[in-house]
Amino acid sequence: MKRTPLFYVVLAIILSSCARPVANFTLEGETQVLSPIVFDNQSENATAYEWDFGDGNTSERAEPSHTYRQSGNYTISLKAINEKGKARVTEKAISIAPPAICLVEIKTIHGSMLVELYDATPQHQDNFVKLVQEGYYDGLLFHRVIENFMIQGGDPKSKDAPAGQALGSGGPGYTIPAEFVDSLVHIKGAIAAARTGDAVNPQKRSSGSQFYIVHGRNVTEQDLAQLEAQKGFRYTTRQKEAYLEHGGTPFLDRDYTVFGQVVEGFEVLDKLAAVPTDPRDRPKEDLKMKIRLIR
């Protein structure tokens, strides 16, 4: 029996409709916390995909990317599904290394900010990490907010504090020696330690728990020149460029210890700084924080 070309076309269609999907993928990128990983989907005979990255996150994109926010061992699964609903699943194990720098995530109702804690200020870094690991900050408020200046939090008295209560005097019962580092300045997003005034604290020791994040305002070359003359130090070219580009609060330099910097989530900082406040600069809505160590 002679088979026509049409026969082979029909046969190919039948065979392809019976073919089961094949699930397969590779991944590209550095396997480290906060480094994006791109997945190369090499599946066959599939029209839909279900990814599970092993950390509670999923995707239905054909070729997704994913960023892990905690180190550890994870199992990634990909389900490839054809148009008839038949499916195949493949899994691969991945080990995510911790970040090369000290990072914390500050969560709020307006989003999250990722903050680097500097190795150059070891006492402040160690103390902040200790408090974070103890859960000290969880549920505390950003109790003082001044747009174009800063947002301040970390007072233990702010937890469940009723509206109208004066805040800002609480702490863990100790202070920390100042750690002024010439290279660390109050550009937008800088995290620094709050403290009591010079009259009662001439050594400029830092609060054991209260901190602020600089929102700042625009800074001009004239502003920096005046501060250099008043305070008797010189900004580096890089510091001047950072202030001119991002703004900040340079008048606080060398008076308050800068020990970190926001590296992600500036739009969240802007939202927090813009909330309505009462005459004491306390936000009218409670801005609760939850801080965790990225490791």
Which ranges hold each PLM region?
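Intrinsic disorder/low-complexity detector
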Residues: 7-10, 42-43, 54-59, 84, ...
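Surface-exposed, flexible coil segments in extracellular/virion-facing regions
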Residues: 48-66
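Surface-exposed, proline-enriched loop/turn segments that connect beta strands in immunoglobulin-like
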Residues: 24-28, 53-54
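A ubiquitous, low-specificity "background" feature that marks scattered single residues
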Residues: 8-10, 47, 216
